């Protein structure tokens, strides 16, 4: 969905508003044996390695209309990965198009960085970190990815929301969006938000709204928007790793379903739950 600016809003100078989208997604599965758990962690570690995450955040930068200044990526031992991308609203490449802006010969030149780069160094960035996790009791394994998209200027991270949902297809999503700082109009009046929003749900495509149950917590006067999403439908086959549903007894299916639903409820509501 398009991010609609406020009508007749003419700004003076640079747009100093900082807009941040925090997108936390969870994937949950049941891995019966230690071998299955290890295989799940290895699968996640390969599926969402630093290279794959880099391609995702690169597409996020393209969607929001940002230019990439620098990328740092890392795979961790025994598992997990992270990518940090520095972005800017305007193109900040070298005057000579044949020069590589990421070449140390170019970036390490003496003298001050361009003003636009300095303005963006600690404001406009995309980061992603992954957290595979399992516990020997109960057979539940989880995977969490945290993506933060922070922009300074006119570009909005909300444009990338649906792409992130599509890329990870998570069981649970916890999304936070906030706007900080202020800019001024041509008359000097402060502007604390420059686009229309009353819920993150405004920017979620209908096809995803139909798939997820969603709840909101909004503190509009503080420009804080919080939305939680959990899949409506539950198919046990989608949560089994290394085991087929047909291999389980009716009693085992019931117990595993209860464990998975309890795990998902605890993650969704952010607290430990009684037996379900």
From Swiss-Prot:
Residue numbers annotated as active site: 124, 129, 152
GTP-binding found in the keyword field: no
GO biological process: spermidine biosynthetic process
Pathway connected to this protein: Amine and polyamine biosynthesis; S-adenosylmethioninamine biosynthesis; S-adenosylmethioninamine from S-adenosyl-L-methionine: step 1/1
Site-annotated residues for Cleavage (non-hydrolytic): 123-124
A Gene Ontology cellular-component term: cytosol
Entry keyword set: Autocatalytic cleavage, Decarboxylase, Lyase, Polyamine biosynthesis, Pyruvate, S-adenosyl-L-methionine, Schiff base, Spermidine biosynthesis, Zymogen
Catalytic activity: S-adenosyl-L-methionine + H(+) = S-adenosyl 3-(methylsulfanyl)propylamine + CO2
GO molecular function: adenosylmethionine decarboxylase activity
Cofactor needs: pyruvate
PTM annotation (Pyruvic acid (Ser)): residues: 124
Post-translational modification: Is synthesized initially as an inactive proenzyme. Formation of the active enzyme involves a self-maturation process in which the active site pyruvoyl group is generated from an internal serine residue via an autocatalytic post-translational modification. Two non-identical subunits are generated from the proenzyme in this reaction, and the pyruvate is formed at the N-terminus of the alpha chain, which is derived from the carboxyl end of the proenzyme.
Lyase is among the record's keywords: yes
EC number from the UniProt entry: 4.1.1.50
Cofactor binding note of this UniProt entry: Binds 1 pyruvoyl group covalently per subunit.
Pfam short name (any one): AdoMet_dc
InterPro entries for this protein: AdoMetDC_fam_prok, S-AdoMet_deCO2ase_bac, S-AdoMet_deCO2ase_core
HAMAP family: AdoMetDC_2
Family: Belongs to the prokaryotic AdoMetDC family. Type 2 subfamily.
Quaternary structure and interacting proteins, as annotated: Heterooctamer of four alpha and four beta chains arranged as a tetramer of alpha/beta heterodimers.
Annotated function: Catalyzes the decarboxylation of S-adenosylmethionine to S-adenosylmethioninamine (dcAdoMet), the propylamine donor required for the synthesis of the polyamines spermine and spermidine from the diamine putrescine.
Record's protein name: S-adenosylmethionine decarboxylase proenzyme
Organism: Desulfitobacterium hafniense (strain Y51)
Lineage: Bacteria, Bacillati, Bacillota, Clostridia, Eubacteriales
Gene: speD
